[in-house]
């Protein structure tokens, strides 16, 4: 089976975005938003030339081919994060006991879930903002992974255990992630 001698992926850098590569660290900056990420894998080179980020690998193996595509996606997400940002929408659902959800500091507090006396909490990751308005929770930020993890933390905090989930459907659920309706 023929083997590619070179894999090369190019990513266009928008006019208002600055990309710096220092060793293995890729830094993407636009205005006040900045994201940094270490991208290190043997045989893979990342550089900038002519307004593009170039990811190259000579005589790649199967794993290196996959990592080149992964790095391309990471850098594209970083560029999109500093320009547009990412937003997840969650919806609060309850049948009998009305939940009270609030965001303070780096935690989301959920009171009166299924009539419980104690407060359930979920961690908010760095650089992520959470807004609660009525029956909707909006999680937004520049780092796609941190926004997704914060939304997952909120959803997991209201997971029903020890009861039939077909009957007890109370909770906070992700209904839209990064523009895709679920």
Curated annotation (Swiss-Prot):
It comes from the Archaea. GO terms for molecular function: rRNA binding; structural constituent of ribosome. PROSITE patterns: RIBOSOMAL_L6_2. SUPFAM superfamilies: Ribosomal protein L6. One of its GO terms (cellular component) is cytosolic large ribosomal subunit. InterPro entries: Ribosomal_uL6-like, Ribosomal_uL6-like_a/b-dom_sf, Ribosomal_uL6_a/b-dom, Ribosomal_uL6_arc, Ribosomal_uL6_CS2. The keyword rRNA-binding applies. Keywords: Ribonucleoprotein, Ribosomal protein, RNA-binding, rRNA-binding. GO terms for biological process: cytoplasmic translation. NCBIfam families: PRK05518.1 (NF004037), uL6_arch (TIGR03653). HAMAP family: Ribosomal_uL6_A. Belongs to the universal ribosomal protein uL6 family. Part of the 50S ribosomal subunit. This protein binds to the 23S rRNA, and is important in its secondary structure. It is located near the subunit interface in the base of the L7/L12 stalk, and near the tRNA binding site of the peptidyltransferase center. This is Large ribosomal subunit protein uL6. It comes from Methanococcus maripaludis (strain C6 / ATCC BAA-1332).
């Amino acid at each position: 089976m023929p083997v590619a001698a070179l894999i090369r992926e190019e990513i266009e850098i928008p006019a208002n975005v600055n990309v710096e590569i220092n060793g293995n660290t890729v830094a993407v900056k636009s205005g006040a938003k900045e994201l940094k990420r270490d991208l290190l894998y043997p045989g893979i080179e990342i550089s900038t030339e002519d307004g593009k980020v170039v990811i190259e690998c000579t005589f790649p193996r199967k794993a290196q081919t996959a990592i080149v595509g992964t790095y391309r996606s990471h850098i594209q997400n970083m560029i999109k994060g500093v320009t547009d940002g990412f937003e997840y929408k969650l919806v609060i659902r309850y049948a009998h006991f009305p939940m009270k959800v609030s965001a303070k500091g780096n935690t989301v507090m959920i009171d009166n879930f299924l009539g419980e006396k104690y407060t359930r909490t979920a961690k908010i990751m760095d650089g992520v903002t959470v807004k609660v308005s009525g029956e909707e929770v909006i999680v937004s930020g520049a780092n796609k992974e941190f926004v997704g993890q914060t939304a997952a933390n909120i959803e997991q905090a209201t997971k029903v255990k020890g009861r039939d989930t077909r009957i007890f459907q109370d909770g906070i659920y992700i209904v839209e992630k990064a523009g895709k309706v679920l």
